[in-house]
Amino acid sequence: MPPPLSPRARTLVGQVKRNVQFHVELHQYNTNPTPHTMADIQFDSALDLLRRLNPRDTKQNLQAITSIVPDLTEDLLSSVDQPLEIRRCPKTNRDYLLCDYNRDGDSYRSPWSNEFDPPLEDGTVPSERVRKLEVAANEAFDVYRELYYEGGVGSVYFWDLDDGFAGVILLKKGVTPGAKSSGEWDSIHVFEATDRARMSHYKLTSTVILHLANENEALGEMDLSGNMTRQMEVDLPVESDASHVANVGRLVEDMELKMRNLLQEVYFGKAKDVVGELRSKPLLCHGRTKAMDADKNTGLAPLSETNKEKAAHLEMIRSMQR
């Protein structure tokens, strides 16, 4: 049984249901979909809705959509990245992160004990070789987390493939919540390692989910939420199984550095410019008022905004004709 919906989620259910029904009716108007096509339509409509809704409410939005169309639950959970949740391992008393890659039914596998909580007798666990790599990777990224994040929670999960293995590196750091501020950073790095002669081919898909909120009586409320995904492929030399941990660590470190710089220089930089422009308009209006008052005192008529725009347009046309 799904958990009961909150009043906000129930309101969202109605909105999502109307949007999904609209998409379905639109496709039905143009085509005569088969049952398979109908499932694809609903899945695409759900993804389209999630892209348009506030990223900080992804969990509630997923809950609302899956309560309408339960058949989409598995596909949506495996396709949509959402903020990571923390659980404590009952055996080792250490925190670990939950995701679709360490889930089996309603149970989650701890990377520290390799056991499921709630207990699961026939849960899927990695082979002995891959489990050893998983343990080594958790130790390595635990150090990485302390050095780069100075706290937070991290977890690494590996699983077997026919021609190699795959894994996911999870990192979560939250801002210490104050009275009017909050924030979270979630990193999800999924990779595949294909074994070759003295080499390994790595495919890495990295996603960062960021939420920052601040409220101030003087400046008002600010909410920056979103996610960004980047991919890369590379061939690296492998001398032993330990080389995989070093290679994956280097790839994740480089990718996180690039994504941090991109967020800071492009996204935060653009947001800063927009906020600066909004804050400068009241000052500009105040300056214009003072200038007009000065013109009145000197007996000069101020140049209208229309004349200024015309003069700018004429100057632009002249520069293009040169």
Curated annotation (Swiss-Prot):
It comes from Aspergillus fumigatus (strain ATCC MYA-4609 / CBS 101355 / FGSC A1100 / Af293). Keywords: Actin capping, Actin-binding, Cytoplasm, Cytoskeleton. GO terms for molecular function: actin filament binding. GO terms for cellular component: actin body; actin cortical patch; cellular bud neck contractile ring; cellular bud tip; F-actin capping protein complex; incipient cellular bud site; mating projection tip; medial cortex. It comes from the Eukaryota. One of its GO terms (biological process) is actin cortical patch organization. This is F-actin-capping protein subunit beta. InterPro entries: CapZ_alpha/beta, CapZ_alpha/beta_2, CAPZB, CAPZB_N, F-actin_capping_bsu_CS. Component of the F-actin capping complex, composed of a heterodimer of an alpha and a beta subunit. Its main location: cytoplasm. Belongs to the F-actin-capping protein beta subunit family. It is found in: Cytoplasm, Cytoskeleton, Actin patch; Cytoplasm, Cytoskeleton. F-actin-capping proteins bind in a Ca(2+)-independent manner to the fast growing ends of actin filaments (barbed end) thereby blocking the exchange of subunits at these ends. Unlike other capping proteins (such as gelsolin and severin), these proteins do not sever actin filaments. Pfam families: F_actin_cap_B (PF01115).
